[in-house]
Amino acid sequence: MRWTPGDVSGDIEDRRGSSGPRFGGAPMGLGGLIMLVLLSLIFKRDFVSMFSGTQEVAPTGQASRSMVEDPAETKMVQFVSFVLDDAQSTWDRVLPKEGGVPYRHAKLVLFRDATDSACGLAQTATGPFYCPADEKVYIDLGFYDELTNRFGAPGEFAQAYVLAHEIGHHVQKVLGISSKVHALQQSDPSEANPLSVRLELQADCLAGVWGNSTAQRDLIEQQDVEAGIRAAGAVGDDRLQRMAGRRVSPENFTHGSSAQRAEWFQRGLASGDLAQCNTFAGR
């Protein structure tokens, strides 16, 4: 993927200098302190500092000055900045024209280990996610190593797909799709999972719409396209269930199968057309 390193995006909140979330600085009882000490000994991590309220969160938009960053991570921050700005610039142009509404920018929060979000605690183990309550995407950059090593989806465009998918969820929020789906899930809980799958597949397609924009500008080649398709398929529910040693149970899918995710990403990538991303048609 062709991209140009530049300044960190103004839409990024860099919290990597913070060890974890604060809990209002409330005093901790002796029992709680003992529990944190035990957890620290068991997991070999400093839970005392993390949860005692003594750690300050890095100021919005910048990392702690004391943080030492290796060159590879610096490059990764520049890369996600480029992808974020490019994706949002694309939606600045596409959404008013094809969706009939102006696009408003999401924020991207970079963190290590854990941080607070309006949707609850964001943790490394959770993976990247979009929180509609604060309109922010949360990513621990360490996930990209996992994408390569655990899920077998290396490459910069594969990494870009992950962020573009989460921005796709923000597009759904701006269009009012997310709130409608949530209301339907509340009214009929039996449809919660199928509706979730449709929402996720649509976000895959929206990521593809941005991918089409990069292709039009010769920022990606065929090998990049293949990497993006592999990334979409790598996180299908059926594959994740097999990796966890469980039987494949479509009734428990929340994101769609590998084949479905790859298919919808390719649909957006091939068309570049928002109208082609209607995963709710015929419902």
Model regions and ranges:
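A Zn2+-metalloprotease active-site environment signal
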Residues: 6-19, 25-254, 263, 270-283
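Short alpha-helical
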Residues: 260
